[in-house]
Amino acid sequence: MVKHKVTVMFGPYVSCGILQYKTARLEGLQELLLSDGHSVEFEKTEDRDDVELVVHGEIVFRCKIQDLQYGGDGKLDPTCHRALEAVQKAY
């Protein structure tokens, strides 16, 4: 299976009443992608509450950052698994 460079573009979200950039919800996604052999790069965007996975310049997966489970390794997070499938199917 081909391994990809995955750019995770994420925007700020409200946590404890404060709008800020946080990667805690992205850790499980990162761990799952790395364990499958992909390289992962984070990039901040202005799109609030949004996460996009970009492979070869194309958006292959999009979700709200709150759809991802906080912390963990991503193995029990169904959204992380859908994202991994989308990356695996990318050209």
Curated annotation (Swiss-Prot):
InterPro entries: UPF0728
Highest taxon of the lineage: Eukaryota
Coiled coil: none
Family: Belongs to the UPF0728 family.
Protein name: UPF0728 protein v1g117062
